[in-house]
Amino acid sequence: METGQRTSRKVRKLGSNRRRQTREPADGEGAAVAPEPESWSSQAAAELQAFFQDCGAKERGFVTREDLAVAKFSFLGSKEESEMIFDWVDVERKGHLSLEEFSSGLKNIFGSSQSPHRLRRRKPLPSKRVSATTSFPALEEADAEEKEAFLAFMEQLGTGHLLPKQMEIWQLWGQLRQEEPQLAGNLAGFLAKMTSRLQEAQADKEALELTLRKRDSDHHREVQQLYEEMEQQIRQEKQQLQAESDSRGLALTSQMQDVLEAKEREVQRLAEGQRELEAQLSHLRSTHQEAASENQQLQEAKRDLAGRLEEVRGQLQVTRGRLDAARGRVSWQVEEKLSFPGAGEKTPDPQAASPEEAPLPGLFGDNDDWDQLLSNFGSPPHGALQLCWSPPPTPRATSGPQTPRVVRQISISEPQAFLFGQEPSSDPDGAPRTPPGVTFSAKDNKGVDPHEQDIRAEQPVEPHDPDPNQEPGSTPEGRLLWGLSGSLVAPAFKVLIPLEDGPPPPANSPPPQAPAGSSKQIQASDPDDKGPGSWAPPSGAQPGAGAGPQEPTQTPPTMTERETQPGPSPTTALTGVGPAKPPRQRDALQQDLHATGSEPRLGTQRARALTLGPAEPFQGLEFVGPVPTERLEQGQAGPAVQEGLPEGLREAHGQVLGLGELSAFPHQELEEEPRSEEGKQEGRGGQDLSSEQSEQSVEAHGLETAHSELPQQDSLLVSLPSATPQAQVEAEGPTPGKSAPPRGSPPRGAQPGAGAGPQEPTQTPPTMAEQEAQPRPSLTTAHAEEQGPPHSREPRAESRLEDPGMDSREAGLTPSPGDPMAGGGPQANPDYLFHVIFLGDSNVGKTSFLHLLHQNSFATGLTATVGVDFRVKTLLVDNKCFVLQLWDTAGQERYHSMTRQLLRKADGVVLMYDITSQESFAHVRYWLDCLQDAGSDGVVILLLGNKMDCEEERQVSVEAGQQLAQELGVYFGECSAALGHNILEPVVNLARSLRMQEEGLKDSLVKVAPKRPPKRFGCCS
């Protein structure tokens, strides 16, 4: 601290001396000006210009510290001095100096021996001083004492090696000692201070350089470390990526290997399958070749047998001709032998001779019994009904039952094989066959069962007329047979009818080769099964035909057995549905039906005419109700054609239905018969006659009132018998593979104890109002209903014996989707009846949906709906019976006007679209516009998307359908008619919605009714 204060005082003294020296020239006038200091040497200027040129400062225009590091000036002592000189010159610490600044700075420092602060001219000293200054000797020439003092001073300062020119300091020191000795001490202090500062700056520089070198080394080390770490991280990443790539490659390789192995196994399996298929194909080819060869052999055998058959027929014709000739020749011989028989003559037994041993008529001897012979060779009368058999005749069996399929193999599908009135070839045996146990003769009643005399009046279907000259069709029995079975044409067999000669026998007669069997084997298991016990006179056995006695093969059934046996099916007996007949046949049918109603013996004969079988009388045909003969002429059908079985026939299974009832359905003329004739119906089992007459009148009235409702039904009736193969198979009776009948239907066949008599009726027929209340289906429904399952025509539950007045639906039995109660005909008294119309574009699946809903089966070959179709669906929802009249409309544009007409009375509408067709979904709004144009505001609407099974081809999402349904405020759902998914649920929900809407409407009506306008009082009140 003291040293610093002393130094500052010395500086102030030095400054004061300077100020005094500067003022001296101004004070002294006329003083001479001091000479100019020593100028900047030309050598230094040349070195400076060379320095500027070498370091490039001349081009740049400035000088930096780095440029001075390589500079070599003669006036500088060392490299450190050059760096320090830059610090002296760079006062502003900019780091760079221009050429002028650097040159002026150097000149100020090294240009003169004077201090850079003494720039002005001083007043010239007195002559003594000038002379002394000029005469101041150099350091070498100075005194030793002064020289030692100066050297000691320099050693004290320690700056001898730092200053560039010691001579200048010597001169300055000497000058100060001579001129101003008081400033010598200040010079020493100044030099000491500057030296210390230079030393401190040098030390700081060295420290900074050391720190810089250390920082540089640390920086290089850190950079190297970071570089090494980065390299190591890069190597690790590369190794990791390589490992992942290798593992992925191994996994893909193993996966591809597994796939290749699986493909190879599949190829091997396919190759094995191909080899197996080739083996099967070769086996099938060989089998086909064998079958073809066998077929060819069978064809040859068939042709051979046909030739033999023609040959036998020719021989038979020749035999008949010879027999006729023999009759004419030997008639007198027969009379003579009958009048005078020989005592020793023995009549040969014709039964003992075999067919091979029977001689021709021309080869007979004189002792032969021609009467017996002629009776054996009797031919059927002209005009008798003939049957054309498709299978070859089989030999008679002595015992054992016969399957019903043989009966249904009668082929009458080719009625044009013989002309009307032409007699086809009869049985190869040449003799007509009578029914088992019954023989006819012109002389006596040989072979007739004792019970035949008792039941002959009750069996009009058996023509036992003793008069041989009477025509078969002239008797009441014949006409009744014609009226009953003239239209009994089932799909399994048909009858070729000669028009002029007489009516045919019943179509339910057994074939001529029906085997003999005991009466215990007679069972009424199926009304269509023509077993050994169900018999009728065949075509060849006519009364009075002149046939000789034949060996009886079976006794006729007794009274109990006949009551047990099912008669002709009520379906075929009542409807008369058959193939298209010529007009003359229909006229004959019309005349015989009218003639039947006028016979006096009808009341007695119809007592046991028909035994009603199970509710499925003939599964090959659709039961369409009674068809009046007047409608047959006009080509129309009654309204009950589509209504199912009439109420008069919906009785318990096994109950006997009289001919009075039966005749009341086809025509109204029988309604005028006296009740005394109807009172003779002993086979009704105690049924009330008043209910029968009311039933007849109701049915006849219904047929009469609906005479003009359904035109053009003739084509419908003609098309019904064209049964499908399935219907023909079903018509052949029950097979072991068939399932039992559904619940609610009585069992097939006769009930235990049915032989004692018919069962009692359980319920009276419906009234006229009930029949009129039932909805009548449209014209297009008959063919669609014909294709339905056989169990869809079950009898009503009212006819069950266990609960006469309770329906299965009313009892709480919820029908399943396949239950016939759920899809049967409409109920007589349903709880709710609604009209539901299906709308949508063509080919969206409306018909398939309704077919699946009604038939429980998906049909693949349905054609487009023409106009409109109609179905009735009965549902039990929440213990309520719903009858839904489902209208299937056509989606084609040409039928839209008809669809709009139907929308006026619709209670519910199902808008159906195809989820695989965006166009059908877009057309939903068009159908809604049609619905609004029709004025149906309060209609319950269901938006239904079909074909959920085609999910891959879906174009309309579920969200789009839900959004549209929310926008329109309707119900929404999706279904699949092909898979049967969500079929019944939307219909059930629709029925509930319709019921809620109707109940709400009723409640609103109840609420509105009490609100009456207040009574107006008079003006005086």
From Swiss-Prot:
Example GO molecular function: calcium ion binding
Membrane topology: Lipid-anchor
Residues where lipid is bound covalently (S-geranylgeranyl cysteine): C1019, C1020
Alphabetized Gene3D superfamilies for the sequence: EF-hand (1.10.238.10), P-loop containing nucleotide triphosphate hydrolases (3.40.50.300)
Span of domain EF-hand: 77-112
PROSITE patterns referenced in this protein's UniProt entry, alphabetically: EF_HAND_2, RAB
Protein's GO biological process: histamine secretion by mast cell; histamine secretion mediated by IgE immunoglobulin; vesicle-mediated transport
Cellular location(s): Cell membrane
Protein name in the entry: Ras-related protein Rab-44
Organism of provenance: Homo sapiens
Phylogenetic lineage: Eukaryota, Metazoa, Chordata, Craniata, Vertebrata
Gene from which this protein is expressed: RAB44
